[in-house]
Amino acid sequence: MSKHIFFISLLFLSINTLSAEELSNVDVTSSVFSNSVNESKYPLHIMQNEEINVNKSIGDNLKGLSGISNADYGSAVGQPTIRGLTGNRTRLLSNNISVNDLSYISGDHINNIDLNNISHIEILRGPSSIFNKGGTSGGIINVISDIISEDKYDNEVFKLDYNSVNNGYGHNILFKRNLFDINMYLSINNIKKGNYSVPHGVLYDEGVEKTTLANSDHKNQNMSFGLSIPREWGYFGISFENNDGIYGIPYHAEEEEEEGHEEEEGHRLFTKVETETYTVKGKVNTVPFFNSIDYSFRNSNSFLKEHEEDGSASLDSNSNSLAFTFNLDDQSYEKRLLLEYNHTKSPMTGAYLPSSESYDRSLAYFLRTKNKPYEIDFAGRYESNSRDSNSQKYGDTSLSFGTSLSSNIGEALRYNLSYAHVSRTPTIAELFANGVHGATSRYERGNNTFSREVSRNIELDMQYAFNEIDLNLNLYRNSINSFIFLKDETTTTSGKTDATWSQKDAVMQGYELSMSRTYLIGNNNLMVTLSRDDISGVFDDNTYIPRISPAKNTLSLKYENQKNDIYYLDFIYSESQGDMSSIETKTNSYLDLDVGYSKKIVLDTHKDLLFNIYGHNILDKAIRNHSSLIKDHVPMAGANYGVDVSMRYKF
C-alpha cells in the first residue's frame, strides 16, 4: 500500500498546476578538477553544509540520496555505499585526496572524516571518478572544505557551535580569516555520545527487554589547522589534522555462544582510533608547456586498536601520497594529465591481518569536447599496484577507461549515455587475511591468487524539465567479473565462524528516479523532492549478493520564508528485502521520518545566531538496515532529538 501511495504522490506532483517557481539546473563545479570543469550533467549529488548533521556518520547523512545506502556498524560507523558497491570500490576523498583509514578492509572500522565546517559533499561517477582514483566502480565521495584555499577568504568568520543528541553533546570552534594576505584556518571540535535508545520491543537479553543498546557510544576529538597563500601565480598551502576517538562495538557474536555470561553492559568492547595527517597543496599558473600544474602531498598515520575481553589487536595505516595534475586545455578540448603515487605501510599486532606494504602507481588522462552541441568525455587510467606481506606477494597492472556522450533533445530533454570499464586490485584483507577478527567474531581467510576484479557498467541518465518539474531517471547495468566478497562458512575455527574471501562473476542492475519542484507560496518557497531507487545483485549461479539494499522511496520537503525560518521533513519508506544470500535473513520494511526547524537571527552586521531543532526517527519505528553486517542483532536508534546552537561573528 505504501508503495502505491508513493507513486500516486508522484503522479499528483506531475499534474499539479499550481503556480510554481521553476527549479533551474544548477551548474556545479566539481572540486576533483581544480580548473572549473563543469560536472552538472552527470549522475551527481551535491549535499550542502546546511544539510549535513555533524552528529551522524557520513553514511547516515547520505543514505537518503538515491542510489546511496549506509553500511553501518552502530551509530559511529556508517560507510557510504553506492549502488551496492562497498569497500574501496566507493572511494572517500577529503579535498580531492584519498582519506587514510582502515574502513576499506572491514565494515566495523570508522571513516576518518570530520564533517564540521565543511563546504559540501559531492558524489561523482563515470569518467570523472575513473580519472581521479583507481578501482572506483562505485564512485567517489569527495568532502570539501577550505582548510587550504586557492582564493582569498571572502567569508572570514569566528564561530562557536554547541549541539546535543543521544544523551551527549558536542561543540566546535572555528576561526577563519585572511591576515597579512595569508588564509588562516583553525577548527577544534569534540563530540561525546552515550548509548542510544532503541524502540520498544526490538531488543531483549535473556528475555529482559532493553531500552538502550550497550556499546553504542562514541567519543571523538578533532583539531584542524591550515595556512594558504593565494596569489596571481597560483597558491600554496599546508594543513595539519589530528583525530582522536573511541567508539563502542555494539555487537560481538561470541556473546551468543556464551552460557551464563554477565549482563551485556559488563562486556566492554570498543575501538580506539587516532590519525595525524599533514598535507601540502598548491598550484602554479605560469609553467612552460602547461596552462597550470596542481600538486599535492599527504602524509597520514592512522592507528586503530580493537579492545576485547580476551586481548587487543592493533592495525595501522601509514600512508604517503603524491599527485600532479597538468592542465592541457586548448580551444577544442578540456584536457588533464594526472600522475599519482601512493605508498602505505600497514604494521599489525595481534590482528587477523599480517603486516604489509602497498604501492599504487598510476597515470590518468581526461578529455572533454568544448564548443559543440554535444559533449564527449573520455578518461583512461593505467595502474601498477603491489601488495606485499612478509610471506606473500601480489602484483598486477591494469587499464581502466570510461566514456560518455551528453546532448540535448529539444529544449526539455538532456541525456547522458556512458560506459565504464574499471579494474580493481584486491585489498590486503582480501589477499592476506588469516586469523580471528574479534569485532565480527569470524576467522577470516584471504586468497593471494585472486585475479583483478573488473566491472563493465553501462548507464543512461535522462533529465527532463516539463511544466516547472525536473525529472531525472538513471538506468544502469554493471557486469562484474571476479567480484570479491566475504562468504560465511558452516565450519568454525578457534570457536569463530569461518569466513572466506571468495570470487564469483556477478551482475548488478537497477534504476534511480527522482522528481523535484519548487512552489512559490506568496514570497516563500516550498521545495518538494520525490525519489525511488531499486537495485538487484545476482551471482552467475543465480544466488544473491549479500547485503544489497532493498528498494527505497523518499519524500523531502523544505519550506523557507523571508524571515529566515526553514522547516524540513525527510520521509523514507524502505521496502522489505527477501532477495538474500544463504548467510542472511529477510529484512522487513520500515518507515523513517526526520523533521527539523532552523532559524537564523541577525543580531547586527557582524553577528548572527542560528538555532536548529531536529528529530530523527520520530515515529520510533524498529529499523533494521539490510546493508549492515549486524542488522539482526543491532537495530538502528529509536526516536531521538537534538538542538544545535551556533553563534557567528563575521569580520
Report the location of each language-model feature.
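N-terminal periplasmic "start-of-domain" segments of outer-membrane beta-barrel proteins
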Residues: 25-53, 79
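Short acidic/polar hinge/loop motifs at secondary-structure boundaries
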Residues: 98-125
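A beta-strand signature from Gram-negative outer-membrane beta-barrel systems
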Residues: 115-157
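Periplasmic-side early beta-strands and strand-to-turn transitions of outer-membrane beta-barrels
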Residues: 142, 150-153, 157, 177-271
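C-terminal beta-signal and adjacent terminal beta-strands/loops
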Residues: 194-196, 423-424, 480-482, 486, ...
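Flexible loop and strand-edge segments within Gram-negative outer membrane beta-barrel domains
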Residues: 214-220, 234-293, 297-319, 346-350, ...
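Outer-membrane beta-barrel signature, preferentially recognizing the C-terminal barrel domain
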Residues: 259-287, 393-394, 408, 421-480, ...
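Gram-negative outer-membrane beta-barrel transporters
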Residues: 332, 369-373, 475-480, 497-580, ...
